[in-house]
């Protein structure tokens, strides 16, 4: 009997022990589940960038921002100013893409991202620009700076001069490449707002999109492959530029341009903890704004505009002006009908009228804010009436 009782007690204690252990496991699982949302919230907060901005490219209007004037190191986004200087000089005829750029000893020893330029090696300015914009080559940036201004110091002065002229008031450049400063040197500084200003200016030059949207390209006769650091080019079909930037102290940065139809956004993200967090954040913002906004066609090139304009001295007495260009206004989808159109035309124009001559303008407004303009021009040449006709008209006769 005692043996049976002892056996029963062993079985009972085993079952109770199992239940206690099982309950302990269950409690741990419940506890983990209970705290998971808080952990996720902390993790999500840690993935937020230090600063960002979303701008509508046509109007330059800032749609959303956080710390957009906070000065931060742009890292390789510094190279966007190099691109602007080169493209501006080419537009003015001061340089050509076929110009040959020679590599100095200093340029050949640049670290970080590079195309391993050798001292004395020469490439066309266009090849150097591809290395700069696609592969973020620091050696190419340095070589271009020396080619344009003679010395690194003089080129940096030019960079700051251009920044000031563009109204980039949060910016100070100290290098053409954006690498971390050596001991005793100052770091490059800018803001999301200033990078957006620069990006908007760069969009005036189609070449910058051609280069920055290229995922891979050959260099040095195909012996070296340029790989684009901007992974957003593969994430969203709308993304076509512009430049990433990173070093440990500043975090992950990117200046993005994206276009869908007539709608284009510029987004600048600075100080993300990881490149994945930066890209996820950028994509989320772009998707939301593409969903919320639309481009409204408010003027079509060549369409008649307003009342006829009286020609005081023309062979013909009146002419009807036309819109000089197509105009699309970005607007929230539920505000499409709120855009107002104001036509400003003179009562009369003296002398001959040339084809394409400006007669007036159309101003587009939303909430009393100007959101777009287009010239009203003459669709044809109207010569001055002869002397006899003009004299007769002064008598009041309609000739």
Regions found by a protein language model. Give the residues of each.
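Domain-terminus/edge residues, biased toward the C-terminal soluble/receptor-binding domains
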Residues: 168, 172, 183-399
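Small-residue packing motifs within transmembrane alpha-helices
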Residues: 10-13, 195
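Active-site-adjacent loops and short helices of periplasmic peptidoglycan-processing enzymes
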Residues: 25-197, 202-206
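Bacterial N-terminal signal peptides that target proteins for export
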Residues: 1-10
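Hydrophobic alpha-helical segments, especially transmembrane helices
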Residues: 3-4, 80, 260
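C-terminal segment of classical bacterial N-terminal signal peptides
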Residues: 15-24
């Amino acid at each position: 009997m005692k043996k049976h009782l002892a056996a029963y007690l062993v079985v009972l204690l085993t079952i109770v022990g199992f239940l206690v252990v099982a309950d302990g496991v269950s409690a741990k699982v419940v506890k983990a589940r209970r705290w998971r949302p808080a952990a996720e919230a902390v993790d999500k907060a840690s993935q937020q960038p230090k600063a960002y901005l979303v701008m509508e490219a046509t109007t330059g209007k800032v749609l959303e921002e956080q710390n957009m004037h906070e000065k931060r190191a742009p890292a390789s986004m510094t190279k966007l100013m190099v691109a602007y200087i080169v493209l501006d000089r080419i537009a003015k005829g001061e340089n050509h893409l076929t110009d040959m750029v020679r590599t100095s000893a200093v340029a050949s020893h640049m670290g970080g991202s590079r195309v391993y330029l050798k001292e004395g090696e020469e490439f066309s300015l266009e090849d150097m620009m591809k290395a700069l914009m696609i592969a973020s080559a620091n050696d190419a940036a340095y070589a271009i700076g020396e080619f344009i201004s003679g010395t690194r110091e003089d080129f940096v002065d030019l960079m700051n001069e251009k920044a000031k002229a563009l109204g980039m008031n949060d910016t100070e450049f100290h290098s053409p490449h954006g690498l971390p400063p050596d001991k005793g040197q100052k770091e490059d500084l800018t803001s999301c707002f200033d990078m957006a200003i620069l990006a908007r200016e760069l969009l005036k030059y189609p070449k910058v999109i051609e280069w920055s949207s290229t995922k891979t390209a050959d260099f040095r006769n195909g012996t070296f492959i340029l790989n684009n650091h901007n992974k957003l080019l593969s994430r969203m079909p709308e993304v076509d530029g512009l430049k990433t930037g990173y070093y440990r102290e500043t975090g992950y940065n990117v200046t993005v341009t994206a276009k869908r139809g007539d709608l284009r956004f510029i987004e600048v993200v600075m100080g993300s903890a990881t490149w994945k967090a930066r890209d996820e954040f950028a994509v989320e913002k772009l998707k939301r704004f593409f969903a919320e906004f639309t481009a409204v066609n408010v003027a079509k090139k060549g369409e008649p505009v307003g009342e006829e304009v009286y020609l005081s001295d023309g062979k013909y007495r009146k002419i009807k002006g036309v819109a000089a260009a197509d105009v699309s206004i970005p607007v929230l989808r539920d505000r499409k009908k709120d855009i107002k159109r104001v036509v400003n035309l003179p009562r009369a124009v003296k002398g001959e009228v040339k084809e394409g001559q400006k007669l007036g303008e159309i101003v587009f407004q939303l909430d009393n804010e100007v959101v777009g303009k287009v010239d009203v021009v003459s669709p044809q040449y109207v010569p001055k009436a002869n002397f006899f006709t003009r004299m007769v008209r002064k008598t009041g006769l309609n000739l």
